[in-house]
């Protein structure tokens, strides 16, 4: 198999990747990230009105019950189901709102009401951040121990690749305005696990190939050869995973399952990006750091 020079344009690829991710995050901050009630607290009422409605009428009904500004979300499947999200309502306010909807729309379905206190939402958000940090630290230790023969630059590069994955996911959520909630945490941890698995496969092949060459051999050739050898497996695994996620997405679109859509869409994008980062980002960073370390040692 002909060896592909994946590192030929590493600086350009890294620069473009960083610019795209930073642009997405800046856009998300400038236009406000959408935090779901899981993390900010609030009340969510989902109900099928079973007849045509005007969104402004729904807002008028809510404003007649409470001064809290609502967010009205319509169903993407074309039916008359609406989701009303506000700051936390009391039980009396929720009951009054349902009664007002029943008065205007006489054939509504059974409503689903969910309340999350703001303090609990903040606690959950902080816990999610801590869990993410702990996961990355443990992965750093694992990669450092397993690939210690490659040097600690390998472990550091793998973690930088994971940080890139996390930042990319934040960029996606900022651009497409997916709500940041408990599903976001599940997507994040899944992508991180998938990406580090791809990276470990490449690193493992690099370690094996380095045993077959002399110390004076160009590490760039070893890296390119290792990525080329693992490329087929990586692509097949990614495609298989994306097909499975695609089935989930189709089901979510047909059945109008909002949670599954919030999970499958960013996950499919993240899986593709995780494959990209394990091939181009982590290995490019590792090669650059490894050359800098050897250059400094030679200078001494």
Task: Show which residues each predicted segment covers.
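A structural signal for conserved, well-ordered secondary-structure elements
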Residues: 1-300
